[in-house]
Regions:
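Positively charged, low-complexity/disordered segments
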Residues: 273-279
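An N-terminal, well-structured beta->alpha segment
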Residues: 2, 6-101, 108, 187-190, ...
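Short, glycine-/Ser/Thr-/acidic-enriched flexible segments
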Residues: 49-51, 56-58, 91, 119-120, ...
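N-terminal small/polar loop signature for handling phosphorylated ligands or for N-terminal nucleophile
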Residues: 85-148, 239-272
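N-terminal glycine-rich phosphate/adenylate-binding segment common to multiple enzyme folds
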Residues: 16-19, 23, 128-134, 144-157
């Protein structure tokens, strides 16, 4: 097994991404941070992949995203799978990582459907089924602090992978050199039809399905809602209006996506503050 310095030097030699090169430069003077970034590879499992943003094999970045996606693409080829759906949340670099996933899939002949903007995770599950995709990928780290991001994989049923599926993919992922992944630009793949944006008609159909499943009437209710700087900032208000709420008050300072979660720091101590902001 190669040691930290060997892997660090390889990245300095082979990486071309400007953000990663800057990150590697900062690691030169910080031994502890360098060790943390390179002492292992990020581990893929049933929950997908999650890690701190930054340069290194133990961090989430464009190279580790490419590695995982190429491994999944190779696994898909074995099964004859050729369709994938991709979306992302409001976290730092989520949109970049979603683009990266789509670019690698398309380079491998996988027809890829991608949302034009960030969406809630359940929407990814929906479009995976709606587009008859074999695999769905959601770039998100759920409830974790802002310095994290993640990569969640879903099956054709819109559910997270079971243990057996994740284990099979791990074998393919471990074979990939992150600096030797064929890719291109999202724009060229959209032009060629290998990548397709999810349209407003599918978003409307999703809201229709949600509306069918409501178990209580909302007419007459006045609702205060905070997206907490996350992905619900468009679909939730749209859904509430469809439910004919009497009034809707959205917390202004938390109404727009913010990957730094500036107004709602993660942690139990801040839960009370979030409620006070809303009411």
């Amino acid at each position: 097994m190669r040691n930290v310095d060997e892997k660090f030097n390889e990245w300095k030699t082979r990486a071309t991404d400007a953000e990663i090169l800057a990150g590697l430069k900062s690691l030169e003077a910080d031994e502890n941070a360098r060790i943390n970034a390179f002492y292992k590879d990020l581990e893929f499992g049933t929950a997908g992949l999650r890690g701190e943003l930054g340069a290194g094999t133990n961090c989430l970045n464009v190279y580790t995203i490419r590695k995982v996606t190429q491994g999944i693409a190779n696994c898909m080829k074995k099964h004859g799978w050729a369709r994938a759906s991709v979306s992302c949340d409001s976290r730092i670099n989520s949109d970049l990582f979603a683009r990266t996933v789509a670019e690698v899939f398309a380079a491998n002949g996988v027809k890829t459907f991608i949302t034009k903007e960030l969406m809630p995770t359940p929407f990814l599950s929906y479009i995976t089924r709606e587009t008859k995709s074999d695999i769905g990928v959601m770039i998100t780290a759920s409830h974790n602090p802002a310095k994290y991001n993640g990569y969640k994989v879903y099956g054709s049923d819109g559910c997270q992978l079971a243990d057996a599926g994740a284990l099979e993919m791990i074998g393919y992922i471990n074979e990939i050199d992150p600096f030797d992944v064929t890719t291109g630009t999202l724009e060229e793949y959209v032009k060629s039809g290998e990548v397709e944006y999810i349209g407003d008609d599918i978003i409307a159909a999703y809201l229709d399905e949600v509306l069918k499943r409501r178990n209580a009437l909302a007419e007459g209710l006045t609702v205060t809602y905070t997206p907490l700087n996350g992905t619900g900032y468009k679909l939730v208000p749209a859904m509430l209006k469809r439910m004919n709420v009497a009034g809707l008050d959205i917390v202004k300072e938390q109404s727009m996506p913010d990957g730094h979660f500036t107004t709602c720091q993660i942690g139990r101590a801040s839960c009370r503050e979030r409620v006070f902001r809303a009411v």
